[in-house]
């Protein structure tokens, strides 16, 4: 029974780790979509950010420098999407898909040119990554039934980006419902002509939303390659941007709903990962691939 309880807690712990980039990207998508901009480019921004974060961390031996570089490139891609879809009034879906295709090809091409490892970056040393944060007295309290075990196995041991992702949900909810910017953001997505007649720039509001989305996508990409992983590999996002987009829609474009959807997708992936090679009743050993 104790082993079953521990396995359950480890699965919840893995759920939080797997769901972190989904949460960050889903919050980014909410900002974009609330402003009236369809942001299919979440996948591309996260992929490019993951590569840049790993590359800069390799060159500077600093995960923090890699994250800031990742945020910068994600903002640039967001502004590129804004230029095509807001200023030039192009098709937003095509613009987003173009960024995804650009990121997919550019990360491999530049990666091969820089590191000659088939589009990958060298493995990052422990000091070049975001390290887990052990909370005070985690080991000492771990022996306490239920509460102590939860504190040690689930709450403690996450890196800073996991906590930032959870904080991003509160930030998004606060910005959308408690600030003047959030009111304008929702208005520009629902009735842009009304906001324009009130003297507020629709384009400026949408660009600000894309910048915030770029910051969140940049952190999601940096998490994949410098926190959850130890470097960049080709197509390492593996469709997580699209999953985050689906989670946002599943959550009805609300931060709380999107969070629950991301945790659900993360839980399913964590369960699938932990069941690999495990003997199951009536089924046998779960396949590895």
Go through each PLM region and give its residues.
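Short loop segments and helix-boundary regions at transmembrane helix junctions
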Residues: 34-38, 77-141, 178-180, 238-239, ...
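Transmembrane alpha-helical segments in multi-pass inner-membrane proteins
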Residues: 227-289
């Amino acid at each position: 029974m104790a082993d079953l309880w521990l396995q359950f807690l480890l699965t919840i712990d893995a759920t939080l780790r797997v769901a972190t980039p989904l949460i960050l990207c889903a919050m980014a998508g909410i900002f974009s979509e609330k402003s009236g901009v369809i942001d299919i480019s979440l996948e591309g921004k996260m992929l490019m950010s993951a590569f840049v974060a790993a590359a800069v961390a390799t060159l500077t031996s600093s995960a923090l420098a890699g994250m800031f570089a990742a945020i910068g490139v994600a903002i640039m891609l967001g502004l590129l999407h804004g230029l095509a879809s807001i200023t030039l009034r192009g098709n937003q879906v095509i613009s987003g898909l173009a960024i995804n295709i650009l990121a997919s090809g550019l990360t491999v091409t530049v990666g091969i040119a820089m590191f000659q490892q088939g589009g990958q970056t060298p493995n990052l040393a422990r000091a070049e990554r975001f390290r887990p944060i052990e909370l005070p007295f985690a080991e000492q309290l771990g022996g306490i039934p239920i509460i102590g075990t939860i504190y040690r196995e689930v709450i403690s041991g996450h890196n800073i980006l996991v906590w930032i992702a959870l904080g991003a949900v509160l930030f998004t909810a606060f910005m959308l419902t408690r600030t003047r910017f959030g009111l304008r953001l929702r208005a520009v997505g629902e009735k842009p002509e009304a906001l324009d007649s009130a003297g507020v720039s629709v384009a400026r509001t949408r660009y600000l939303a894309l910048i915030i989305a770029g910051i969140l996508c940049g952190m999601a990409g940096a998490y994949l390659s410098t926190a959850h992983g130890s470097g960049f590999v080709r197509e390492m996002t593996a469709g997580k941007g699209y999953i985050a987009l689906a989670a946002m829609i599943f959550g009805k474009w609300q931060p709380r709903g999107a969070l629950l959807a991301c945790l659900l997708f993360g839980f399913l992936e964590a369960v699938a990962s932990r069941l690999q090679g495990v003997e199951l009743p009536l089924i046998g050993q779960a396949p590895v691939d």
